UniProtKB/Swiss-Prot annotation:
It is found in: Secreted. PANTHER family: C-C MOTIF CHEMOKINE 1 (PTHR12015:SF5), SMALL INDUCIBLE CYTOKINE A (PTHR12015). The gene is CCL1. This is C-C motif chemokine 1. The keyword Disulfide bond applies. GO terms for cellular component: extracellular region; extracellular space. Residues 1-23 form the signal peptide. Transmembrane segments: none annotated. It comes from the Eukaryota. GO terms for biological process: antimicrobial humoral immune response mediated by antimicrobial peptide; chemokine-mediated signaling pathway; chemotaxis; eosinophil chemotaxis; inflammatory response; intracellular calcium ion homeostasis; positive regulation of cell migration; positive regulation of cytosolic calcium ion concentration. Disulfide bonds join 33-57, 34-73, 49-91. Glycans are attached at residue 52.
Length: 96
């Protein structure tokens, strides 16, 4: 009887799961979005690597990983960003 009760509770909870949950972002935990972008050029010597923002983000750009443990976002359409991208390596994925 306890197994049936547990199964019913699980079904009820699953039915209450919101349907507007963004399942894509749950599948790609390493992805990130940018909401503000660097207005001035970041010196190339300060950047370790870059990665693209996720395709599910409203703003497409690059996330630069900086040497002091910080990150900065930049629009991929800006000239200096495109030049830096050609000179840098892509950041390794943190996925296991």
């Amino acid at each position: 009887m306890q197994i049936i009760t547990t199964a019913l509770v699980c079904l009820l909870l699953a039915g209450m799961w919101p349907e507007d949950v963004d399942s894509k972002s749950m599948q790609v935990p390493f992805s990130r979005c940018c909401f503000s972008f660097a207005e001035q050029e970041i010196p190339l010597r300060a950047i370790l690597c870059y990665r693209n923002t996720s395709s599910i983000c409203s703003n497409e750009g690059l996330i630069f990983k900086l040497k002091r443990g910080k990150e900065a976002c930049a629009l991929d359409t800006v000239g200096w960003v495109q030049r830096h991208r050609k000179m840098l390596r892509h950041c390794p994925s943190k996925r296991k």
